Amino acid sequence: MKVWMAILISILCWQSSAWAVCPAWSPARAQEEISRLQQQIKQWDDDYWKEGKSEVEDGVYDQLSARLTQWQRCFGNETRDAMMPPLNGAVMHPVAHTGVRKMADKNALSLWMRERSDLWVQPKVDGVAVTLVYRDGKLNKAISRGNGLKGEDWTQKVRLISAVPQTVSGPLANSTLQGEIFLKRKGHIQQQMGGINARAKVAGLMMRQGNSDTLNSLAVFVWAWPDGPQLMTDRLKELATAGFTLTQTYTRAVKNADEVAHVRNEWWKAKLPFVTDGVVVRAAKEPESRHWLPGQAEWLVAWKYQPVAQVAEVKAIQFAVGKSGKISVVASLVPVMLDDKKVQRVNIGSVRHWQEWDIAPGDQILVSLAGQGIPRIDDVVWRGAERTKPTPPENRFNSLTCYFASDVCQEQFISRLVWLGSKQVLGLDGIGEAGWRALHQTHRFEHIFSWLLLTPEQLQNTPGIAKSKSAQLWHQFNLARQQPFTRWVMAMGIPLTRAALNASDERSWSQLLFSTEQFWQQLPGTGSGRARQVIEWKENAQIKKLGSWLAAQQITGFEP
């Protein structure tokens, strides 16, 4: 009873999280958005099931289908079954296809496994489900999954797939098998290669007329033998003897969720002969086939892999001004998980790049992780019906603006503070963008070094700065006074690399001010253009004012 209560609680929590991200739309807007996405998915369904082609990646289709279902639940519309084909299949399945319930995570799987025994794990092969009917030792009929009760007659197509045994014997002579027609792969590593749109490719080959030779690129993985032998080992042995060898090779006994996780991770990284999108855990003991119904299989569940890319909704478009004055665009997202990382923001790049992407709040974008786990945009997969894009700030900033605070300089000013506090500059541990914003909002800095004048009492009374942290922060600010001269010059934004600055051997502000363009040009990695930038920088009125202020604070190297 406790287990079922835990499962019920987890379901309710999942539903609550789904409702928490319902769009704030009027009924009319909701109807329009749902209708547009519904029409698009119907078109994709028609292309997939009637013509055997796909205009969208499998993963994108699945996630947008889930998004549609979520919207329908949010606004009280009827839900649709994801991946539901047109109900025009005329051939009855001898045994219904049940489908498989998805587990949200390892904990949910553990709860499910706790009350069951004699459990086995198989790869969730990514292809198209099929029923194989053998009568008197011969392949009598092959039926597409359809709606689980009826499907299309695929017998002639399947007979052309050389990997499917056309004759069997023994217990299989009069049997019904269920499995997955898949695209044969040589050494497919799911972690590296992803789904390659395998499901759509298989559907395309099965739905198209002619091209019988290409069907030999397909094979079948049998995952169910309704009313077969009681023992799983006997089932696997008979299937292997008949030619369905993959089932025995890739079916393993498991006792708990830890063992499933181990196998799941192994298959995620291993070279396999097919594309997968997770694992299926099934109990060897199954009800009689006459009790099988779509959506009612309690003896098996799936634990899918986390998608390599996730569809995320854009909440807002934000503009950031860097320390050099460049404007960059960031998309704020409804959070998604990618490889155990919560992604809430993704950098779009320049204003021009954003305009080329044509991204607005409400759009659905495909996000993945690039090198070092940095989120990136792969595609815009759906654009909302109502699209209002914000106006970017005027391009009035450059590398010599916003050393002093003003309303128009807010973002670049904060960027300069974040830069000077970084490890490679003044090394102010324990303060980032949020902390600088809190300090500036409360104490209204005049310029980028005004924080040097803050007292322990002021820091302690700053909203957003914990009292326990304020003493540590004051200590960090005091330690900064002992940083070398070159670190302070870097904090002022001198347009030189650290290597070039160190090579200059400049040790005082007065010495730096008298250095010529020719002197700077001789430094490693510093050409004539960069040397002119240094001259412009040191002659800038704001820079000179900051130098004088640091001298008054008796910062090393700035004293007269």
Swiss-Prot record:
InterPro entries linked to this entry: DNA_ligase_AS, DNA_ligase_B, DNA_ligase_CS, DNAligase_adenylation, DNAligase_N, NA-bd_OB-fold, NAD_dep_DNA_ligaseB, NAD_DNA_ligase_OB
Enzyme class: ligase
Entry keywords, A to Z: DNA damage, DNA repair, DNA replication, Ligase, NAD
Cleaved signal peptide residues: none
Superkingdom classification of source: Bacteria
Enzyme Commission number, as recorded: 6.5.1.2
SUPFAM superfamilies according to UniProt: DNA ligase/mRNA capping enzyme, catalytic domain, Nucleic acid-binding proteins, RuvA domain 2-like
Residues annotated as catalytic: K124 (n6-amp-lysine intermediate)
Gene Ontology molecular function terms on file: DNA ligase (NAD+) activity
Record-stated family: Belongs to the NAD-dependent DNA ligase family. LigB subfamily.
Protein name: DNA ligase B
Species of origin: Escherichia coli O7:K1 (strain IAI39 / ExPEC)
Gene name, Swiss-Prot/TrEMBL: ligB
